[in-house]
C-alpha cells in the first residue's frame, strides 16, 4: 500500500474528550472516528487491525471444531418475551417497532436467536454436541459509553453457543473453549489471566473471564503469588485468619455526635480502623423480614455479589433508604451496629474474629466501644461478605493474593438449561423421550481486544503492537527525500514491489513529507519494522532497520535485507 493512495488520517494533538490511552491513540493513529455517543467509524488503518484480530479468532474457533454461522442483528421481540428476558434486561436493550407495528430489538447478544435456530434445526441427540459461532455486530444502549471502543454502544463480538445432552458433554466443550481462548489471546500477544467469575444476568452455573492486565481496566483481577488461582474480585473468596481474642475491657456507650462515618470515628477517637465495623442495611428477601443488616470491618468493602447469595438478602441487591432504616431501627445510617439490632444480622467472617471493637449503638449520635461477641451480643450468622484485599491468603491455600486492574476481553459460561427450558428447545433423547438441551456460551469482544492490546502495549510515540500478526502493516518502507533522489526512489520502488510479491504486508511512504513526519506517523500507527532508505547509506550498500517493539536500530547490507527481514517478521 502506498501512502499516496491511502487514507492516512493521523493527528498531532490528542482530542480533549479521550480519557484512556487506547482511545487517544486510536484517534491519533487514524483508526477510528466518532459518529455518535459510543459509536465509531472504523477507518482503513483501524479496520486492517480489526480484521486481523478477527481472522485469528476465526482460525482458532475453526480449529476447535466450532461451526461459523451468521444471525441478524435485528431480533423479534417475541423471542425475548419467550426467554423471559424482555423485562429483565433493562434499558440497555434497544427496542423499536417496524412499519407493521411489530416489536423488535437491536441485539445485545444472541442467546434467544441461536436457541430458536437450533430448536428448529436439531431434533435428535445424535446431532449433538454442536458448537456454533458468529462474529457479528452487537448494540447495547449503555447509559454512559466511555473510553472509546472499550465501552461503546455498538461493537463487534465473537459469540459462540454450544448444545449438549449431558453436563459431561458441556464440560468437555467448555474445557475446549477455555483452551481455545487461551490460544487466541496468546497468539494476539496479550498478557492475560483466565479468572473465575460471576455469571451475571446471562445466568448459568460456571463462568470464566479472560482479563487483559492493564491499569486502565475496569475490573479488579485477583490472583495468587504461588499458584494458578485467579478470580474476578466479585467471586474471590475472602479467608479470615486467626482466632478471636478474649475481651480486655467492658462495653461502653459513648457520645459521638460528630462521628457519622468510619473515617470520622477513627480520627476523633483515635481508634484503629480494623477495630471498627460498618453496618449496612439492605432489602430482605421476604415480607416477614424486609430489611437485613450486613456487618463488615471498617476497612473492608461490601461485595454485593456475595451478599445476594445469602438467602435472607433480596435479589437484585438494593440498599434500604434512610426513611426505611429510621422507621425500623430508630437511628440514622451513621449510628448503626449489631448490638440490639431489631432485624436479622449477617456478619462477615473477619468480623466474627473481632474483639473489643466499636460500632453504632442504634441511637443517633452514640456508639458502643469494646463490643465482644457472645458477651455483649449473640454471634449472628456468618458469611463471606467482603471484597478480598492484597495480602489475604489465597483460597487454595497457596501464597497470598495480588490485585491488578484488568480489561475483560472474553467470557465463557455454562448456561445449563436457562434458555432451552424457557424456549422449549428439546431433542429426542436416547430413550426416545424429549430432552431439554444443555447450553454453553462463549464470547470475545473483538473491538475491545484492539483497545486492550493498545492499553497494554504503547509508549510516548504511539502504539506498539504486541505481535506483527495484528499490526496494520508489517513493514514500512520510508525513503528520505525520495522526490529529490533518483537512486532512493528507484531502490524504494523496487524494494516495495519485491516485498509485496513475497506476501509481506508493506506500506510505502511515498509522500512529499519531512523524514521526521514520516517516522512519527509510522511509529504512531505501530508498524513493527521500518526500513529507512537514505542516499548516503545506499552509496554504502546499506539500509537502516528500526524495530518498533525493541527500539533496535542497525544497518543492513542491501543484498542481505530480505533474509534479514524473514528472520525478524513475526518474532
From Swiss-Prot:
Database matches in Gene3D superfamilies: Anticodon-binding domain, Bira Bifunctional Protein, Domain 2
Pfam family, one: HGTP_anticodon
Enzyme category, top tier: ligase
InterPro entries: aa-tRNA-synt_IIb, aa-tRNA-synth_II, aa-tRNA-synth_II/BPL/LPL, Anticodon-bd, Anticodon-bd_dom_sf, Pro-tRNA-ligase_IIa, Pro-tRNA-synth_IIa_bac-type, Pro-tRNA-Synthase_IIa_type1
Keywords: Aminoacyl-tRNA synthetase, ATP-binding, Cytoplasm, Ligase, Nucleotide-binding, Protein biosynthesis
Catalytic reactions of this protein: tRNA(Pro) + L-proline + ATP = L-prolyl-tRNA(Pro) + AMP + diphosphate
Family: Belongs to the class-II aminoacyl-tRNA synthetase family. ProS type 1 subfamily.
Database matches in NCBIfam families: PRK09194.1, proS_fam_II
Subunit comment: Homodimer.
Domain notes: Consists of three domains: the N-terminal catalytic domain, the editing domain and the C-terminal anticodon-binding domain.
Protein name, as recorded: Proline--tRNA ligase
Amino acid at each position: 500500500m502506498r501512502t499516496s493512495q491511502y487514507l492516512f488520517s493521523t493527528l498531532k494533538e490528542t482530542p480533549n474528550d479521550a480519557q484512556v490511552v487506547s482511545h487517544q491513540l486510536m484517534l491519533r493513529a487514524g483508526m477510528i472516528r466518532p459518529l455518535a455517543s459510543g459509536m465509531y467509524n472504523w477507518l482503513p488503518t483501524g479496520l486492517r487491525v480489526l480484521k486481523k484480530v478477527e481472522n485469528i479468532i476465526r482460525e482458532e474457533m475453526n480449529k476447535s471444531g466450532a461451526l461459523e454461522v451468521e444471525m441478524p442483528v435485528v431480533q423479534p421481540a417475541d423471542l425475548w418475551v419467550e426467554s423471559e428476558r424482555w423485562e429483565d434486561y433493562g434499558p440497555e436493550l434497544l427496542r423499536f417497532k417496524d412499519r407493521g407495528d411489530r416489536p423488535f430489538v437491536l441485539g445485545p447478544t444472541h442467546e434467544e436467536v441461536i436457541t430458536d435456530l437450533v430448536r428448529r434445526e436439531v431434533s435428535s441427540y445424535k446431532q449433538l454436541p454442536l458448537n456454533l459461532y458468529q462474529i457479528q455486530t452487537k448494540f447495547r444502549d449503555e447509559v454512559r459509553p466511555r473510553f472509546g471502543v472499550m465501552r461503546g454502544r455498538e461493537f463487534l463480538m465473537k459469540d459462540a453457543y454450544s448444545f449438549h445432552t449431558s453436563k459431561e458433554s458441556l464440560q468437555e466443550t467448555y474445557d475446549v473453549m477455555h483452551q481455545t481462548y487461551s490460544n487466541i489471546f496468546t497468539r494476539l500477544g496479550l498478557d492475560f489471566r483466565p479468572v473465575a467469575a460471576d455469571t451475571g444476568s446471562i445466568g448459568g452455573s460456571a463462568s470464566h473471564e479472560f482479563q487483559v492486565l492493564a491499569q486502565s481496566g475496569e475490573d479488579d483481577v485477583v490472583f495468587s503469588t504461588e499458584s494458578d488461582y485467579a478470580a474476578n474480585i466479585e467471586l474471590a473468596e475472602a479467608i479470615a485468619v486467626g482466632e478471636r481474642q478474649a475481651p480486655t475491657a467492658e462495653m461502653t456507650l459513648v457520645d459521638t455526635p460528630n462521628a457519622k462515618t468510619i473515617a470520622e470515628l477513627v480520627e476523633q477517637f483515635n481508634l484503629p480502623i480494623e477495630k471498627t465495623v460498618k453496618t449496612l442495611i439492605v432489602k430482605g428477601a421476604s415480607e416477614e423480614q424486609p430489611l437485613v443488616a450486613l456487618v463488615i470491618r471498617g476497612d473492608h468493602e461490601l461485595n454485593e455479589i456475595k451478599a445476594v447469595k445469602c438467602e435472607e438478602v433480596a435479589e437484585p441487591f438494593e440498599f434500604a433508604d434512610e426513611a426505611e432504616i429510621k422507621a425500623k431501627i430508630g437511628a440514622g445510617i451513621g449510628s448503626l451496629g449489631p448490638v440490639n439490632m431489631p432485624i436479622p444480622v449477617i456478619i462477615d467472617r473477619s468480623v466474627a474474629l473481632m474483639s473489643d471493637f466499636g460500632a453504632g449503638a442504634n441511637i443517633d449520635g452514640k456508639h458502643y466501644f469494646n463490643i465482644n461477641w457472645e458477651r455483649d451480643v449473640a454471634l449472628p450468622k456468618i458469611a463471606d461478605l467482603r471484597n478480598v484485599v492484597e495480602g489475604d491468603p489465597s483460597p487454595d491455600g497457596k501464597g497470598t493474593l495480588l490485585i491488578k486492574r484488568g480489561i475483560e476481553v472474553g467470557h465463557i459460561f455454562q448456561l445449563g438449561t436457562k434458555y432451552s427450558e424457557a424456549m422449549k428447545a428439546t431433542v429426542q433423547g436416547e430413550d426416545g423421550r424429549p430432552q431439554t438441551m444443555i447450553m454453553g456460551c462463549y464470547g470475545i469482544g473483538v473491538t475491545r481486544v484492539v483497545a486492550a492490546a493498545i492499553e497494554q502495549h504503547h509508549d510516548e510515540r504511539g502504539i506498539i503492537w504486541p505481535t506483527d500478526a495484528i499490526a496494520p502493516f508489517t513493514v514500512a518502507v520510508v525513503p528520505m527525500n525520495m522526490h529529490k533522489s533518483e537512486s532512493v526512489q528507484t531502490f524504494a520502488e523496487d524494494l516495495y514491489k519485491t516485498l509485496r510479491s513475497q506476501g509481506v504486508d508493506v506500506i510505502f511512504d511515498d509522500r512529499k513529507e519531512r523524514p521526521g513526519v514520516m517516522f512519527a506517523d509510522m511509529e504512531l500507527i505501530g508498524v513493527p519494522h521500518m526500513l529507512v532508505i537514505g542516499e548516503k547509506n545506499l552509496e554504502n550498500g546499506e539500509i537502516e532497520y528500526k524495530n518498533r517493539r525493541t527500539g533496535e536500530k542497525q544497518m543492513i547490507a542491501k543484498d542481505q535485507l530480505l533474509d534479514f527481514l524473514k528472520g525478524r517478521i513475526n518474532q
